[in-house]
Amino acid sequence: MTRSPFRRLVFGTLRRLLYLWVRSETINQSSFTLNLDRSRPVFYALQSPSISDLAVIDTECRKAGLPRPVLSVAVGNLIEPAAFFYLTPSPDWLGRQDKRGAPPTLERVVAAVSQNPGEDAQIIPVSVFWGQSPDRESSAWKLLFADSWAVTGRLRRLVSILILGRKTRVQFSAPIHMRELVGENKGYELTLRMTQRLLRVHFRNLKSAVIGPDVSHRRTVVKGLLDEPLVKQAIIEEAEREHITQEKARERALSYGNEIASDYTYSVIRFMEVVLSWFWNKIYDGIKVSHIEGVQEVAPGHEVIYVPCHRSHIDYLLLSYLLFRNGLTPPHIAAGINLNMPVVGGLLRRGGAFFMRRTFKGNPLYTAVFTEYLHTLFIKGFPVEYFVEGGRSRTGRMLQPKTGMLAITLRSFLRNSRMPIVFIPVYIGYERVLEGRTYLGELRGATKKKESIFDIFKVIGALKQRFGQVSVNFGAPIKLAEFLDGEQPDWREQQLDPQFRPEWLSETTHRLGERVAQHLNEAAAVNPMNLVAVALLSTQRLALDDQAMERVLDLYLTLLRAVPYSPHTTLPEGDGRSLIEHVKGMDLLAEQKDALGKILYLNEQNAVLMTYYRNNVLHIFALPSLLASFFQSSSRMTREQILRYTRALYPFLQSELFIRWPLNELDDVVDQWLAAFVEQGLLRFKKDAYVRPEPSSREFVLLTLLSRAIAQTLQRFYMAIALLLNSGQNTLSPEQLEDLCTVMAQRLSILHGLNAPEFFDKSLFRHFIQTLLDLGVLRKDSAGKLSYHPMLGELAEGAAKRVLPAEIRLSIRQVALHSNEEEQDVGTDQGAA
């Protein structure tokens, strides 16, 4: 087409005419530099002949500064008049396809590289998508226009250009280096066939990743579930158990399937894209996306399961929007049945949501239908999204993973592992969450209300506020097969029956949940709200003067940059001053001026709200805060002392906050933090020991503020131990200890003026007690009562002296003693009665 000057003139004219209507964009600009050697010749591989595709690719190459496909290129002595070829040859005049031969250009390139050891050629697979439709067979109209798995004719392509040309996307992939393939010394013919095979597999996987796998209509999928052995058996058992006919049980199963299944509709996806583009840029200050290129690399050829943290109802919409905008198929999303509300439920279902009940208990037929539906999605390669936390986090911290969906995923993979599964953690960070005021009420003890359509209007009423920016970070992928290889090396040899439940499933699922939570926290997006919250909530009066606040924020930024939490963690740009101005602009910081300057403070309402944003990043500050705590009671400590107490307390912090480092890496990380402290003047290293600054110094004030980030967490730990020790051996059950801890924490929060309702969160005490049991610190007797090691008191007191002030320890012991006396009085009264 572009071999002669005349044809190039015609091509240029056609391209200009095409772009009177067409608008195109490249999906992944970052891939342009991925292993691309600009000194080596570049060829572009297109899947099938299309002058419109070539015109779009040529335009995108010009925009990106890449070599153009329509210009000549040299490989040694070989001069090719154009730098592109079609993997599938053009049909002959009778429309017949020649599937035997390789593209002539590719044949000549392979020969040139084979014959000249110093030469190389880079082949970039490139695809053009006219529209991006994830539902393949639900509409004849969309099948006619959007890219699909059907062969596209000239008339269909013309209509596609007219209808979808303004939403055209180009995907450039990493180049294939011919020198590497030729270097395998397999001969010309085999190298040629190997190159063709690589390109064919690449195009097939890429198409699946971008426009979605080939899928039947929703009705066909739901009806197909009823013919699966697992569901058929459940129908028979349901009929016997409920004393109904099998036909009636089958109808019940069908109704469950219709209740569950999504109804992906492309028009809704496009509608949401338009609406949400306005929303993110009108309500929020846009979206900052990090590390999505890792998803684009791993998605082809994998069943992708997105596992985001859950902070807001708009999480459902946000991830689908971002994936669609970045050329990836929006996932099928697990949503609670409570969201299947009038109007909203239908919209969510057409946007990819499938609905699940909060509990499957007592309904084996529903369980079978739901399990089989998920299995169908997995084996067909549909991207899926679910929240391992179960519900939205009201406290801002990562919730303990709910393992139900993970267990279903694991069992499905054990049944059929042909499609490799990869989990993609997605951290979603809001500078201001839409439901913030609702969470504020719930944190203060208000009963959690059931969602309704009217909640939307409450949120809309708050939209006049400034909400800042949204950050979305994609974390390190977790490949399920590799995870299982580490946990259960013989998993491939075990039976594949749908009912198979290996003994190790529960424990392995629990560890998978922990791994996902850790990877989510690794991808945290630290924002100005988080840092200001950490700083002000560490003060006694929730206030700092303007200059001191700037110094604290500058210190935190410096420390976090010196000791990065993980490669996937992101930090805000700018310095402490810019962070202060940013948060002030969101009306969350109050300001008071006097003759000495400005004081920044939090009012009572915002102080509680800011605990949410502090908790988002508490896992990042936990270890440096713990190290700083050691120097509140001790003026000097050796490295060995620091490591000993850190190792003693770290497992409990790690378990609660899902901190990333295993115990065998802890010493190195502690050394990095100590070095950073010394660099910033927070500590001095003198005579084989670390020495704190003078108590009257500015550096000691900074060290003290840093130590308070996890002070309440450490107090809760000490509180539980104190109550247990006061009660004695084999006296309390875990549930009784949990209740006592909650009451004691409420009392202490009043006595010490702690305005943080999560301080007496029952679930945190429950998890700490379970961690003590898991680590063998506590044991349960036959009656379910707790016993502990005789040295527990001495060890706990020794650690507490290092991290908690004497007055706090004394107050906790006194309240614990008083609580124990009250418990004994209640027991005596009940016995007398």
Swiss-Prot record:
Drop me one GO molecular function for this one: glycerol-3-phosphate O-acyltransferase activity
Main subcellular localisation: membrane
Its GO biological process annotations read: CDP-diacylglycerol biosynthetic process; fatty acid metabolic process
Q: Where in the cell is it found?
A: Cell inner membrane
- Membrane topology, from the record: Peripheral membrane protein
EC number(s)?
A: 2.3.1.15
Comment, domains: The HXXXXD motif is essential for acyltransferase activity and may constitute the binding site for the phosphate moiety of the glycerol-3-phosphate.
Q: Which family does it belong to?
A: Belongs to the GPAT/DAPAT family.
The name under which this protein is listed is Glycerol-3-phosphate acyltransferase
Taxonomically, what lineage is the organism?
A: Bacteria, Pseudomonadati, Pseudomonadota, Gammaproteobacteria, Pseudomonadales
